[in-house]
């Protein structure tokens, strides 16, 4: 279900991160995922969204590909709106935590296919939720 250039860029970022990520960046991802988990308890959607952005930014920076990072940054505002809608659904939070853990695991092991698959699932879940929100608002 993934669609759009942003999805393509994110998949590329995950694949490059599998090749280039450092031990320090893996530790940063783990810390960002833990911070995200803690911030979820605050129910402050802005803080939660910013914590999620920090997690994904570590992946993007790990690519060491300035052009790709720039392209993803250009899409940041559009992606942020969708992210906020998704993060408002508290029932999705346990799944997000699990997906972040799986992304860390597969990137740290350099398992490109598994990392890409989980990132696609992560994106698809967000897209599906946003579509549901739009449909609900229309009715």
Predicted regions and their residues:
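Short arginine-rich
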Residues: 124-133
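…primarily DNA-binding HTH/wHTH and HhH modules…
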Residues: 135-139
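Single conserved hydrophobic/aromatic residue that forms the stacking wall/gate
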Residues: 1-6
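Active-site loop of classical SDR/Rossmann-like NAD(P)-dependent oxidoreductases
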Residues: 91-94
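Conserved amphipathic alpha-helical segments that form helical-bundle/coiled-coil interaction surfaces
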Residues: 20-85, 98-106, 114-125
């Amino acid at each position: 279900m993934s669609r759009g250039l942003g999805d393509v860029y994110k998949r590329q970022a995950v694949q490059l991160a599998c090749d280039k990520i450092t031990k320090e960046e893996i530790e940063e991802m783990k810390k960002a995922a833990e911070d995200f988990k803690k911030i979820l308890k605050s129910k402050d959607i802005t803080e939660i969204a910013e914590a999620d952005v920090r997690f994904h930014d570590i992946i993007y920076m790990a690519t060491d590909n300035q052009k790709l990072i720039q392209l993803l940054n250009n899409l940041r505002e559009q992606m942020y709106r969708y992210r906020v809608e998704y993060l408002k659904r508290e029932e999705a939070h346990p799944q997000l935590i699990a997906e972040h853990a799986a992304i860390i695991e597969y990137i740290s092991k350099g398992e490109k296919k598994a990392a890409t698959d989980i990132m696609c699932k992560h994106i698809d879940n967000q897209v599906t939720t946003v579509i549901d929100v739009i449909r609900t608002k229309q009715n």
